[in-house]
């Protein structure tokens, strides 16, 4: 019988934006905006992006890994289920990641938008279970850090 392993990890990423919570929240809620910062990315080509932003709604992205990645030609799929949405305050979602046809993780993520004098503090908390040699918490935190860099660029757009 094949032995199955799981590694658990939690990380928190905090960012400050010179934008209102309404604008930062919109970058998560509007499919066109989210696709620009979330679904794009260096080293892969987006093949699928579907988003239904509502409690009970789902999101699915699939990108094909490029030749300079450790898994050239392999699909990386994100399947998301929206658990809780409070406009301009928080989004809670559960998501799984697949590499090819192998599920590599399942996570619960909470994004909080806190109004400040200078704009918005975003607090991203990820609680994950990483399966059999999956990417693990450190790599996932690095991936989300890169995604939030993309969010910074999206929020700088006019």
Regions from the language model: what does each represent?
Residues 1-45:
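Hydrophobic ligand-binding cavity/cleft-lining segments
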Residues 7, 11, 76, 107, ...:
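Exposed loop/turn and edge beta-strand positions of beta-sandwich/beta-sheet ligand-binding modules
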Residues 10, 124-131:
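A short small-residue
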Residues 24, 34, 59, 82, ...:
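Hydrophobic pocket/interface hotspot
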Residues 29-30, 39, 87, 149, ...:
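Residues at helix-coil transition
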């Amino acid at each position: 019988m094949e032995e199955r392993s799981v590694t658990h990890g939690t990380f928190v990423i905090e960012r400050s934006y010179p934008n209102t919570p309404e604008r930062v929240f919109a970058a998560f809620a509007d499919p066109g905006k989210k696709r620009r910062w979330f679904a794009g990315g260096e080293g892969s080509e987006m093949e699928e992006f579907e988003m239904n932003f509502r409690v009970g709604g789902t999101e699915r992205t699939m990108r094909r890994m490029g030749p300079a990645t450790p898994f050239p030609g392999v699909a990386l799929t994100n399947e998301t289920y929206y658990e809780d949405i409070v406009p301009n305050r928080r989004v809670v979602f559960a998501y799984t990641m697949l590499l090819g046809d192998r599920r590599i993780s399942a996570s619960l993520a909470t994004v909080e938008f806190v109004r400040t004098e200078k704009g918005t503090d975003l607090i991203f908390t990820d609680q994950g279970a990483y399966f059999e040699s999956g990417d693990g918490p450190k790599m996932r935190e690095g991936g989300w850090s890169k995604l939030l860099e993309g969010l910074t660029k999206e929020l700088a757009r006019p």
